[in-house]
A protein has these predicted regions:
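Hydrophobic, membrane-embedded alpha-helices of multi-pass small-molecule transporters
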Residues: 14-24, 163-170, 179-246, 279-288, ...
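Helix-loop-helix connectors at the membrane interface of multi-pass transporters/channels
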Residues: 35, 105-120, 211-212, 292-319
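Membrane-water interface regions at transmembrane-helix termini and the short interhelical loops
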Residues: 37, 65-74, 129-150, 212-215, ...
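Selective recognition of specific alpha-helical transmembrane segments in multi-pass small-molecule
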Residues: 56, 60, 153-164, 227-251, ...
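TM-loop-TM module centered on a large, flexible mid-protein loop between adjacent transmembrane helices
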Residues: 72-73, 239-289, 305, 341-343
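Membrane-helix boundary/coupling elements in multi-pass transport proteins
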Residues: 99-104, 277-308, 372
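Membrane-interface loop-to-helix entry segments
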Residues: 137-165, 339-351, 370-377
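A generic transmembrane alpha-helix motif of multi-pass inner-membrane proteins
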Residues: 161, 168, 365-440
Length: 440
């Protein structure tokens, strides 16, 4: 019994480390310092809002899929076909079309270019995705590779930089923030990372890995994955808070005119000199590799399952790596221009389904579909308005300034659907199915 508990604890640490790396990514390292710089003495307030809207929603996604059993079950409340369309759009837009190519571009910009200026970006991207291909080929080993090997190195580098910045701050923290509303800025920055969507594809490989190690559905799986999610959340809290504080310590030296990547590079160089730039390059490189591994593996696993195994996991890994290498060199901006509005549309209904799965898993599917329709209609109108089609009505909706204008329509449509389920005609039609379920 003690041996089983010890093994479970070890798995929690490994899976938790893997989840940390998956959500951390290379892009997210640049946001907390910039927010800390803008917020000045109110950096903790801005950071808290950012963390809740980013990692808070992402952890909700993890616990939602854990509660109902899988990522597919979270989305299936909207109906089988809508769920497949929604999941396919999420995986395509988050993984091979945007995030995976961006990992290579970020690694080159922040890790290679400052330290090895003579390396061609084309040659680097080919080498980068060749490495990702090799590390992703064994599906069941992905979580172990990330959790046991790469994440500890990543954490050592991150905490070395953060601790140096705490022990020897770079300057005084500005009394007044550079932005008008610190909390709103933090919420918008966290929400716009869309990390909650990443929980759905990441959940695929996490649950596969845990199940393959003998932790089946039930309390054992809940203990391992739930504990891992909490560990990842604590690590992300510590790292993001530390980075936000570093940004606050230079709030009297820089303004919003500096780029996000330039700010973190300037902080690292001021703290640790050229050695720090090299260490940070290693940190960013590891973050890019771990994120690319997670995204590639989860996308390949999903599409292989969608094809009912007719196309193998390894074939999809190879295809995704080749496609991402091409996109990272030839057309990332164009692909992002296509994918960004799609993500703007699908994010609100996906969040609705995550919240319902976590908070009200036994609610009638009519209610879920009603809430999804309300969120989807609003997100379509808001996206059209954002991209040049005038829909002035959406600006009058509550929470529009936060990007959360879909919340009220989702609630209203969900309540309307709940009233529909109470109609006598609907109850009579569902009575036979309910009785059959009780007998089983």
């Amino acid at each position: 019994m003690n041996g089983q508990k010890k093994n479970a604890l070890g798995e929690i640490v490994i899976v938790g480390f893997a989840l940390f790396s998956m959500f951390f990514g290379a892009g997210n390292v640049i946001f907390p310092p910039f927010l800390g710089m803008e917020a000045g003495s109110r950096w903790l307030e801005g950071f808290s809002a950012y963390f809740i809207a980013d990692i808070g929603l992402a952890m909700m996604g993890m616990f939602a899929l854990l509660r109902v059993g899988s990522s597919e079950q979270v989305l299936r409340r909207a109906g089988k076909l809508p769920a497949e369309i929604l999941m396919c759009a999420i995986v395509l837009c988050i993984d091979p079309m945007v995030a995976i190519p961006r990992t290579s571009a970020s690694a080159y910009e922040m890790a290679i270019a400052p330290n090895l200026s003579g390396v061609s970006p084309v040659v680097f991207s080919v080498a980068f995705f060749a490495l990702i291909l090799v590390l992703c080929l064994k599906e069941s080993a992905v979580v172990d590779i990330v959790g046991k090997v790469l994440t500890p190195l990543l954490l050592v580098g991150l905490f070395a930089i953060i601790i140096k910045g705490i022990v020897a701050p770079l300057g005084e923290i500005a009394d007044l923030p550079q932005i008008s509303n610190v909390t709103v800025t933090g919420i918008k920055a966290g929400y716009q990372t869309m990390d909650a969507l990443a929980a759905l594809p990441f959940g695929i490989i996490i649950l596969q890995s845990v199940t393959a190690k003998g932790y089946k559905q039930g309390k054992s799986q809940l203990r391992v994955v739930g504990g891992a999610a909490l560990l990842a959340g604590v690590l992300l809290l510590a790292v993001y808070m530390g980075l936000a504080y570093l940004g606050a310590t230079v709030s009297t030296q820089y303004t919003g005119s500096i780029g996000r990547a330039a700010l973190i590079m300037a902080i690292v160089e001021a703290l640790m000199g050229k050695t720090g730039v090299v260490i940070f390059g290693v940190v960013v490189g590891l973050a890019c590799v771990t994120t690319a591994i997670a995204l590639t593996s989860s996308a390949a696993a999903y599409f292989s399952e969608l094809c009912r195994g007719k196309v193998s996991y390894k074939a999809f890994v190879a295809a995704i790596c080749v496609f991402s290498a091409v996109v990272s060199n030839l057309g990332l901006d164009r692909i992002v221009a296509v994918a960004a509005p799609v993500l703007d549309v699908v994010y609100p209904p996906a969040l609705v389904l995550i919240c319902i799965s976590l908070i009200m898993p036994k609610v009638h599917d009519f209610v879920s579909r009603g809430a999804v329709i309300g969120a989807l209609l609003t997100s379509v109108l808001c996206t059209l308005h954002t991209y040049g089609v005038s829909v002035p009505l959406v600006e009058a909706l509550p929470l529009y300034d936060l990007g959360l204008s879909w919340v009220l329509p989702a609630v209203v449509f969900g309540l309307a659907a709940q009233l529909v389920t109470m109609l006598p005609s609907v109850r009579r039609r569902e009575e036979p199915a309910r009785r059959a379920g009780e007998k089983n």
